[in-house]
UniProtKB/Swiss-Prot annotation:
It is an enzyme of class 2 (transferase). HAMAP family: PdxJ. The lineage of its organism: Bacteria, Pseudomonadati, Pseudomonadota, Gammaproteobacteria, Vibrionales. The keyword Metal-binding does not apply. This is Pyridoxine 5'-phosphate synthase. GO terms for cellular component: cytosol. Signal peptide: none annotated. Pfam families: PdxJ. The record marks 153 as: Transition state stabilizer. It catalyses: 3-amino-2-oxopropyl phosphate + 1-deoxy-D-xylulose 5-phosphate = pyridoxine 5'-phosphate + phosphate + 2 H2O + H(+). One of its GO terms (biological process) is pyridoxine biosynthetic process.
Length: 243
């Protein structure tokens, strides 16, 4: 079976730093530890309100990462310009609302097709690989294809938040079907949001999924076990699910 890759989201290291307005813990240091522990890439979300990751973080991480940067951002002129200046390997376009604690759902590509397509084309022309964070919905996948996005990231929040085994299995089936559908269209499929050490294996076992982006669970585990072990343990579960 094909390999699966782990992108470690380090936003919540920045959240902890910003809670006191200090210079520590530094997400740049966290990225270096995560890479040494087996992370295949580092994911960061530069929000419009800069609530965790800052422009400084983006700049230094771009200079120091040994793996690849996946820059999550809203579909705005400001963010597109920052991406063009920064030149990350990947940009993931996500929905964003100031009042939300975290990204609450997938990007409505279908409802803003021309806007997303324009951003995708601009970033692609600069050599940046674009991913669209969407729900496991065929119409949204078709819209992503129409935008020319080579990657999508399937939103796993509904799966992660399911209150019963039946609901979770239903959400898992939706994700698996969406991954297969997108793969058949020639789109590379990533997934993420709300994944934990307890629920990640079933998602990692879906053969069409290329990479999982996971942050909160890893940073939470790192408080008790250390970041290197937290990353290595998550990667081990994912790899075992592919055997």
């Amino acid at each position: 079976m094909s390999s699966i890759y782990l992108g470690v989201n380090i936003d919540h290291v920045a959240t902890l730093r910003n809670a006191r307005g200090t210079q520590y813990p530094d997400p740049v240091h966290a990225a270096e530890i995560a890479e040494r522990a087996g992370a295949d890439g580092i994911t960061i979300h530069l929000r419009e309100d800069r609530r965790h990751i800052t422009d400084r973080d983006v700049r230094i991480l771009r200079e120091t990462l040994q793996t690849r940067m996946n820059l999550e951002m809203a579909v705005t002129d400001e963010m597109v310009e920052i991406a063009l200046q920064t030149q990350p390997e990947y940009v993931c376009l996500v929905p964003e609302k100031r009042e939300e604690l975290t990204t609450e759902g997938g990007l409505d590509v279908l409802g803003q097709l021309e806007r997303v397509k324009a951003a995708t084309e601009k970033l692609t022309a600069a050599g940046i690989k674009v991913s669209l964070f969407i729900d496991a919905d065929r119409e949204q996948i078709d819209a992503a294809k129409a935008c020319g996005a080579p990657f999508i990231e399937l939103h796993t929040g509904h799966y992660s938040d399911a209150k019963s085994d039946v609901d979770q299995q239903n959400e898992l089936k939706k994700i698996a079907a969406a991954a297969a559908y997108a793969h058949d269209l020639g789109i590379t499929v990533n997934a993420g949001h709300g994944l934990t050490y307890h629920n990640v294996a079933a998602i990692a076992a879906i053969p069409e999924i290329y990479e999982l982006n996971i942050g909160h669970a890893i940073i939470g585990r790192a408080v008790f076990d250390g970041l290197a072990k937290a990353v290595a343990d998550m990667k081990a579960i994912m790899v075992a699910a592919r055997r």
